[in-house]
Amino acid sequence: MNKFLRHSLLLALLTGALSGVANAQTDKLIIESGDNARTRQDAAMDKEQWNDTRSLRQKVNKRTEKEWDKADVAFDAKDNCEKSANLNAYWEPNTLRCLDRRTGRVINP
């Protein structure tokens, strides 16, 4: 019986000690919708930066499109030059032109 009493007392002490640690103060509840002054300010700054870089993005896109068009035209010109019936026509890869072997002048096959 004495042993049972000691174990019960020890269990009661441990339960009391642990229950004090496990209790949390839950009388306050904070709910944020995510729509506060900081997020609105961040969104406004992001929009302003996006608008400020608009012309730069347009320039980059135009340049990319221009380079792609140039490569596309050169590919077609090379294809036409290589398929040409003119035996003196050859494709110059450095200048991206079809030239005459004898004169070195540009020819249109």
Swiss-Prot record:
Which family would the database say this protein is a member of?
Answer: Belongs to the UPF0482 family.
Q: Where is the composition biased (Basic and acidic residues)?
A: 38-55
* Pfam annotation, one family: DUF1283
Cleavable signal peptide: 1-24
Using the UniProt annotation, give all residue ranges assigned to the region (Disordered).
38-63
Q: What is this protein called?
A: UPF0482 protein ESA_01750
Task: Return the InterPro entries for the record.
Answer: DUF1283
Q: Which UniProt keywords apply?
A: Signal
Query: Species name for this entry?
Result: Cronobacter sakazakii (strain ATCC BAA-894) (Enterobacter sakazakii)
